[in-house]
Amino acid sequence: MKNRLPLIAALSLCLSSAFADEGMWTFNNFPSDKVEQAYGFRPGQAWLDHLRMASVRIAGGCSASLVSSAGLVMTNHHCARSCIENLSGLRHSDYNRDGFFAKTTADEARCPGMEMNQLVEITDVTKRVQDATQDTKPESFNDVQRATLAAIEKECGTADDVRCEVVTLYQGGRYDLYKYRRYQDIRLVFAPEDRIAFFGGDPDNFNFPRYDLDVSMVRIYGSDGKPLRNAEHLAWSDGKLKDGDLTFVSGNPGGTARGLTLAQFDDERDDALPRNMLYLAELRGYVTQYQERGAEQKRQSNDLLFGAENSLKVNKGRHEALADTAFHDQLAANEKGLRARVMQDPVLARQYGGVWDTIAELVRKDQAYRNEYMALERGLRSSSLFTIARGLVRHGDEMGKPNGDRLREFGESRLPQMKASLLANKPVYDELEISMLTWSLTRLRADLGADHPIVKRVFGKRSPAQIASDAVLHTRLKAQQVDAHGNVVGGLRKTLYDGGKAAVDASHDPMIELARALDPDSRAIRNKVETEVDGPLKRQQELLAKARFAVYGNGTYPDATFTLRLSYGTVKGWNEGGHAVPPFTVVGGAFDRATGADPYELPDSWITSRNRLDPATPMDFVTTNDIIGGNSGSPLVNRNGEVAGLIFDGNIHSLGGDYGYDPTLNRAVAVDSAVLLEAMDKVYGAGRLVKELTDSTTALAAGKSAGTR
């Protein structure tokens, strides 16, 4: 990421108008006019509605799409990695190594704890939210807003198959209510071997050329236990994309920070990102050491290592962007320009002139709390058993409160996902749990200090390893009773969840006791941050959004919020150090790149199928679509709304995309639809899937009446 200069020009994106191809647009504010002006095609409302209904969100942090009328869903292999590894553990297999294909629907395997959401309705609730908090004191802002959002979400629906979320857009300039259909019976249908899904491993991650078949197919099942019968789904493209072709990506980008102030950018650069990188580097090293114990330990922890390495590279890329002097100077110039425009208008100056200084003060206060907050509220998440125990303790405490007073994650609209997460029948590995909890407790002691009252009270005379071993080996949270359909029907977790606070308080389970010992202090620092920092900051960001609207208008896109967005772009390579990077790779290139050793070792299925594959078939390609983490698994469609590719990554320059879009260098990376079909057919013998995909057509997906050319 040496050449950052082109990114500087892109930094006007959150302040005025966006470049062509830039933006993660909401479906109710998509710039069809701009697309038509640039490319001669106007996505109509029917086209947009169809694509929206065919797009789904994986609640754990990815995107996906419906690709048949029988609930078949396409996403990335790395988005289904947890499902693949959980099923491997439960079935004493290694589907990550060997791949998985269900030859019949009866063989499709339920993914523990997996949830998908389909966006069905968007409603503007800005006035109600802003009116409720208008005269609120800064220290009460968070509580009042939380109660307001909880009430809106509860009114929207609380049934298990409904999920409602109030989404904050433009840092508080707008609030939309998103209503979803919720699906919690998701079954694995197809996944290739990890050696081809993640060919090139961490060295090739966020790079291009790539030769990855990063795909998984799962199926949504209805409440009747049968495959979903869905009216909307995407048809498969029967043509090949060419350089310069128009492309659209529909997905759920996790989050960007393009609308922050300079004080917040500096905090990211100087404290938040370095802190994250240190944590992730240590986690990567610790997991790598664990993997060296043996093949089984490696299998158990592959998902952990993938997440650590991926996140570390993302954080490094973000830090490099903010550490670039010219980039930072342009950020400062942009803020100076907006402040000058505000101060030139007496009315705007009176309303918004103090926002930047107030935010800077809140950033300093946040820094003072950060160490304790990260240690207590975030620091023990690497242990799945501790996470479950804390969830059960908090569930017991929160359910006795009115909906509006609960922690956000325990609001009525979020309870079905919380329950599924806490009760999910996933394999638990004692050795891995002891190792990760030992590391987490060691970090807790180091971060707070050995003489900290919390450390003295919780640790006593015991070491982190002793606490972890006792809690993991003697907890009864591991044992789950499930029925023939994979539903949890018994076990301590269910008993404590159903029994509420009384049952949790009476429990002497060592993992519950550990969570209970830490929770009062964790809650206290969380409440302090939410009351003294988050609430006042939300008020100031809301004012800043109004200032931007007043100066620049509202024709821009909001920062990403892990909600459904649509971006447009074209198939296009880029220039790297004076050399052209072509936009496509082909199947033959994968065999040329293979070395026979990890991470460039092709699976046996590909080696034995080489003569059946066309070496000229497009494999991976890049486009100018504006994406970010969370877009993994997004369908890439052509102007006909047909599947032409599957997003799985961005190039190295896209890592600065949190803070700006660079039209000359930022690229999205996708698997070509052609190789998806060819591999399923000629490598994996998945003819039933190929037939299901190619037979699934709709009149609208053909594009004839969906838009204008």
PLM-predicted stretches and their roles:
Residues 2-4, 15-709:
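Terminal presequence/propeptide segments associated with secretion/organelle targeting
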Residues 6-11:
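Sec-dependent N-terminal signal peptides
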